[in-house]
């Protein structure tokens, strides 16, 4: 009888599900070239980029045919997208040569300009075959009294998906962020002239 009970230990009524490894995608976007920053000049403070409604999690997001949003558990960004976009924005503008320094909140430098943002759209639309990004920005000149708003704009970009798999979606999302940052740099350059 004990032999029979020992044999049942290997039996299970639970289905055997394979382990699925989570993949984390970096959202590291760099300006293609680095311009020389002036040694004496303006300082830009980039405040935190807020996550728009529903964009606070790390899962890769795509639209389903019925219009609902799928947030994947196994395919995710290495950090929350708004945090990555904030860091990407700071590095992009530092490499632009527009400012002598681009700093984060907490810096001891006195900034003439402040940039605030909100990530409004960050999704792959598999039905349309594109990745969509929208970033709202406000550029403030802190020098005059009262403070002056130089720019308030929402930059958007769509980049074609190579296919509908997660690596292609992640690559298209990075390319869309790069396009939004390229356009934002041009807007900021025009606003501070």
Where are the predicted features?
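Extracytoplasmic/secreted envelope proteins and their assembly/folding machinery
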Residues: 82, 86, 90, 96, ...
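N-terminal export leaders
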Residues: 1-2
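Extracytoplasmic
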Residues: 39-44, 57, 72, 110-117, ...
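A short, hydrophobic beta-strand-centered structural micro-motif
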Residues: 43-47, 88, 103-125
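Amphipathic beta-strand/beta-sheet edge segments enriched in Tyr/Trp
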Residues: 123-159
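A structural "domain/chain start" motif
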Residues: 12-81, 191-193
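Short secondary-structure boundary motifs at beta->alpha junctions and helix caps
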Residues: 68-76, 144-183
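C-terminal motif of bacterial Sec signal peptides marking the signal peptidase cleavage site
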Residues: 7-10
């Amino acid at each position: 009888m004990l032999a029979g009970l020992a044999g049942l230990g290997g039996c299970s009524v639970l289905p055997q599900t394979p382990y699925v490894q989570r993949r984390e995608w970096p959202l590291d976007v760099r300006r293609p070239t680095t311009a020389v920053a002036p040694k004496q000049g303006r300082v830009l403070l980039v405040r935190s980029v807020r996550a728009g409604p529903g964009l606070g999690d790390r899962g890769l997001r795509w639209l389903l045919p019925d219009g609902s949003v799928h947030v994947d558990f196994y395919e995710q960004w290495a950090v929350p997208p708004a945090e990555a976009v904030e860091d990407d924005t700071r590095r992009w503008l530092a490499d632009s040569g527009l400012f002598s320094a681009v700093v984060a909140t907490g810096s001891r430098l006195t900034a003439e300009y402040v940039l605030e943002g909100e990530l409004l759209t960050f999704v792959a639309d598999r039905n349309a075959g594109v990745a969509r990004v929208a970033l709202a920005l406000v550029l403030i000149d802190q020098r005059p009294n009262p403070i002056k708003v130089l720019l308030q704009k929402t930059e958007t970009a769509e980049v074609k998906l190579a296919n509908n798999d997660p690596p292609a979606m992640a690559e298209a999302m990075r390319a869309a962020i790069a396009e939004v940052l390229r356009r934002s740099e041009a807007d900021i350059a025009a606003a501070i002239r």
